[in-house]
């Protein structure tokens, strides 16, 4: 057996011809052709949505090969040092718990966007490169290519643009805004960058 995983879950693959597994190692990207079958009732796996079916492999094509030993096991990536996880982020994102966090965040943002729109708010994006403004943290600055010695600041919050919109008559505005603050890490946000519903 092998477990075939994609964005949507895991499927058990039955290998009846051992030669199909020649050269196959963990975390390779595979294309498997075969026959989908119902599992015998005593082999059902209620822990996964595909637990009543399995794929009998007739052909396996390797789409992406693994040439080196993996730096960590995918299912335990959350226990690994953060610098290692970030270096191999493409592997860390294969961990179901990490993926589920990203999917959850996407659903929350979609929900907020729909709710605000339903209440008559207009979604407006404000500029990212702007003048520095007096906020609570230090600015991240971006040098101007055109104006030597001049700098843009990344917004700590879209406050000034929100006030411009309100003064212009946009009374129901929202955005899911990136905010950039050159400050130390906090328990509730990443150092330097976070998103907020404004």
Residue map of PLM features:
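Class II aminoacyl-tRNA synthetase catalytic cores and aaRS-like
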Residues: 1-198
């Amino acid at each position: 057996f092998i477990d075939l995983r994609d964005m949507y879950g895991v499927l058990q693959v039955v290998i009846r011809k051992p030669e199909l597994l020649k050269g196959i190692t963990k975390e390779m990207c595979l294309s498997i052709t075969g026959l989908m079958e119902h599992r015998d009732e005593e082999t059902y796996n209620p822990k996964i949505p595909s637990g009543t079916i399995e794929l009998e492999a007739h052909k396996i094509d390797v789409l992406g090969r693994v040439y080196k030993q993996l730096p960590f096991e995918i299912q335990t990536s959350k226990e690994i040092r953060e610098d290692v996880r970030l270096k191999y982020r493409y592997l860390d994102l294969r961990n179901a718990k990490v993926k589920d966090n990203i999917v959850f965040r996407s659903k929350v943002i979609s929900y907020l966007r729909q709710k605000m729109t339903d209440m008559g708010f207009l979604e407006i994006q404000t500029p990212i490169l702007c003048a520095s403004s007096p906020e609570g943290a230090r600015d991240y600055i971006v040098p101007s290519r055109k104006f030597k010695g001049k700098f843009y600041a990344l917004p700590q919050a879209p406050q000034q643009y929100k006030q411009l919109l309100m003064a212009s008559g946009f009374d129901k505005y929202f955005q899911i805004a990136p905010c950039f603050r050159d400050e130390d890490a906090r328990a509730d946000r990443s150092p330097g960058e976070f998103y907020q519903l404004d």
